[in-house]
Swiss-Prot record:
It is found in: Host cytoplasm; Host nucleus. Transmembrane segments: none annotated. This is Serine/threonine-protein kinase US3. The gene is US3. It comes from Human herpesvirus 1 (strain 17). ATP binds at residues 197-205, 220.
Length: 481
């Protein structure tokens, strides 16, 4: 799985600077109640400052040069006869599992070489009383913190660029078209390309303009059926906080979505800030996000990949939810679990998804809770694995959630067929935090009490007890004072 930021398609920092590509022809428009939560009495500790990066003895290549070089190589790989692309049998095998995989779909088999916990890991974990709060300047145990000094001019860290290299090679091995071919298709429809944004595993994204649109637009060109699936979903949706589909073109088997261009994705927006957002701005972002989630759930749709990279923003009062490539339709009742399968991003997946259990629309509530947490803290991601090539599989992610939140054994689902309960309940045996009280991670972050309450309710461990988006919108944060 690529790093979370790889699928960022709206961030202006990471895009390649290139001259506008003139249009060739004129296009034809195809169509114009959960558990009670008890806050503890102790106050939250201030978030420690970012760590100072260690000096390097070697001068690495420019990040902008690496990004441009990567895009140029991708554009030449299929067209250069000296470097033919051979079919990768392992890629074919992956295609048999999920032929139309969207961006950042979690593939557990890719982590076969990851070191799992030892055999005695099913025993008790360290209890809440055994965790010593870190001194000032240290990071909380196991929680990733982004340092502004690690982010280069392109908006990517060195680890993220390495992940992009691997993901781009994987996309080509699965039969993806190079950016040069995709650019010709886009300009052939009358668009002028002003820049190529970070390529994704299912297609290319271009910053474009067209005489039919008064402002810049984003053209997302994808070769997998997941792009067509996303187009069908977007055509059904009409909500101010959901990314609208302006137009749709299908050329040579490639589906091109025309979307409005926002200033940045929420991940990039938060990374650029020096300080966290205020309570009114956090409430505005949270209200719009939960309103969009409530709307799609009432339409019988589960997004399954809600994260800051898939939320686009002009201002905190103007955001929208996008990237529906991993979405699916509800089967049966919204409250009845169904085995939809794993999809989305491991770091933001709900525990029941990671365990392979049937699930409901409340998996989106868990992911939305993580987004609201990042919006409030702005420089850290809860439950995220350390960066680098060795990122833990689903098993390690569940263990990380249990450890960092100090999940109590009584907070697991009582359902006898729950894999999450049968396989992982024993790992919470040593956790001493009383059930349904403030999770352990709240000790390390200072948040408005109403924001903290909202996040904790959204991150209810048992999906059956997790509140709906409509219920969360009734919490004190959204009530006028």
């Amino acid at each position: 799985m690529a790093c979370r930021k790889f699928c960022r398609v709206y961030g202006g920092q990471g895009r390649r600077k290139e001259e506008a590509v003139p249009p060739e022809t004129k296009p034809s428009r195809v169509f114009p109640h959960g558990p009670f939560y008890t806050p503890a009495e102790d106050a939250c500790l201030d978030s420690p400052p970012p760590e100072t990066p260690k000096p390097s003895h070697t001068t690495p290549p420019s990040e902008a040069e690496r990004l441009c070089h990567l895009q140029e190589i991708l554009a030449q790989m299929y067209g250069n006869q000296d470097y033919p692309i051979e079919d990768d049998p392992s890629a074919d095998a992956a295609d048999d599992v999920d032929e139309d995989a969207p961006d950042d779909v979690a593939y557990p088999e890719e982590y076969a070489e990851e070191l799992f916990l030892p055999g005695d890991a099913t025993g008790p974990l360290i209890g809440a009383n055994d965790h010593i709060p870190p001194p000032c300047g240290a990071s909380p145990p196991g929680i990733r913190r982004r340092s502004r000094d690690e982010i280069g001019a392109t908006g990517f860290t060195a680890e993220e660029l390495d992940a992009m290299d691997r993901e781009a090679a994987r996309a080509i091995s699965r039969g993806g078209k190079p950016p040069s071919t995709m650019a010709k298709l886009v300009t052939g429809m009358g668009f002028t390309i002003h820049g190529a944004l970070t390529p994704g595993s299912e297609g290319c994204v271009f910053d474009s303009s067209h005489p039919d649109y008064p402002q810049r637009v984003i053209v997302k060109a994808g070769w997998y059926t997941s792009t067509s699936h996303e187009a069908r979903l977007l055509r059904r949706l009409d909500h101010p906080a959901i990314l609208p589909l302006l137009d749709l073109h299908v050329v040579s088997g490639v589906t091109c979505l025309v979307l409005p261009k926002y200033q940045a994705d929420l991940y990039t927006y938060l990374s650029r800030r020096l300080n966290p957002l205020g309570r009114p701005q956090i409430a505005a972002v949270s209200r719009q996000l939960l309103s969009a989630v409530d709307y799609i759930h009432r339409q019988g749709i589960i997004h399954r990949d809600i994260k800051t990279e898939n939320i686009f923003i002009n201002t905190p009062e103007d955001i929208c939810l996008g990237d529906f490539g991993a979405a699916c339709f509800v089967q049966g009742s919204r409250s009845s679990p169904f085995p939809y399968g794993i999809a989305g991003t491991i770091d933001t997946n709900a525990p029941e998804v990671l365990a392979g259990d049937p699930y409901t629309t409340t998996v989106d509530i868990w992911s939305a809770g993580l987004v609201i947490f990042e919006t409030a803290v702005h420089n850290a991601s809860l439950f995220s694995a350390p960066r680098g090539p060795k990122r833990g599989p689903c098993d390690s992610q569940i263990t990380r959630i249990i450890r960092q939140a100090q999940v109590h054994v009584d907070e697991f689902s009582p359902h006898p067929e729950s894999r999450l309960t049968s396989r992982y309940r024993s790992r919470a045996a040593g956790n001493n935090r009383p059930p349904y009280t403030r999770p352990a991670w709240t000790r390390y972050y200072k948040m408005d009490i109403d924001v903290e309450y909202l996040v904790c309710k959204a991150l209810t461990f048992d999906g059956a007890l997790r509140p709906s988006a409509a219920e969360l919108l009734c919490l004190p944060l959204f009530q006028q004072k």
